[in-house]
Amino acid sequence: MKVHKESTGLLVSMATLFTGICLSLFYFLGASIVSYLVMIIAIFLYLLTINFFRCPKRHSPFANDDRAVVAPADGKIVAIEEVSENEILHERCIQVSIFMSIFNVHANWFPCEGKVTHVSHKNGHFIAAYLPKSSTDNERSAIVIKTEKGARILARQIAGALARRIVTYAEVGDICSVDAHMGFIKFGSRVDVYLPLGSQVEVKMDQKTVGNQTLIARLPE
């Protein structure tokens, strides 16, 4: 399993900082309990960060299925409801939300096959991502995908209390695949998917999801 490219700068900075601290402690304090304790803590934090930025290579069993909508992220289903999406789509939709804890893979996949027709970013707050109001109040990025049959799917990356940086790779005009990454969110967050009414939801509340693998819905025929 490789480490995500978004980790490069942070891991280099952490390695430099931790190495400097440990060398200084061993120089001034020698091989003391404090020196070894700090070194162990530094190694633990570094390995924890590597684990957070892990980036598994996956191939979806639903690639090329024009009705399939897959989970864009690892996590847990925290909302399934009919809502009015008034910010971008301006229509009634089915919202399926996935909460990502700091222990989940934080790469985000495209939820369906199609063409990107809209990408935007909006500043906001950083309240806990598992709360419903995070969908409308938090900093977020939005990606709209139009399928071959004309359905519009909105995927919204939402920052959380710890996740204060959203990275979006999608650009308007991109032809997207469920096997491709649409972005990355650092340190705990949420992804909302807005589906056309009439879509058949295939997940339940509190169900665990695997990005790119779990079928969350089938679009209307």
Swiss-Prot record:
The active site is at S189 (schiff-base intermediate with substrate). Binds 1 pyruvoyl group covalently per subunit. The modification Pyruvic acid (Ser) is found at S189. One of its GO terms (cellular component) is plasma membrane. Its EC number is 4.1.1.65. InterPro entries: PS_Dcarbxylase (IPR003817), PSD-A (IPR033175). One of its GO terms (biological process) is phosphatidylethanolamine biosynthetic process. Is synthesized initially as an inactive proenzyme. Formation of the active enzyme involves a self-maturation process in which the active site pyruvoyl group is generated from an internal serine residue via an autocatalytic post-translational modification. Two non-identical subunits are generated from the proenzyme in this reaction, and the pyruvate is formed at the N-terminus of the alpha chain, which is derived from the carboxyl end of the proenzyme. The keyword Transcription regulation does not apply. It catalyses: a 1,2-diacyl-sn-glycero-3-phospho-L-serine + H(+) = a 1,2-diacyl-sn-glycero-3-phosphoethanolamine + CO2. The record marks G188, S189 as: Cleavage (non-hydrolytic). Pathway: Phospholipid metabolism; phosphatidylethanolamine biosynthesis; phosphatidylethanolamine from CDP-diacylglycerol: step 2/2. Keywords: Cell membrane, Decarboxylase, Lipid biosynthesis, Lipid metabolism, Lyase, Membrane, Phospholipid biosynthesis, Phospholipid metabolism, Pyruvate, Zymogen. Its cofactor is pyruvate. Catalyzes the formation of phosphatidylethanolamine (PtdEtn) from phosphatidylserine (PtdSer). Heterodimer of a large membrane-associated beta subunit and a small pyruvoyl-containing alpha subunit. This is Phosphatidylserine decarboxylase proenzyme. The lineage of its organism: Bacteria, Pseudomonadati, Bacteroidota, Bacteroidia, Bacteroidales.
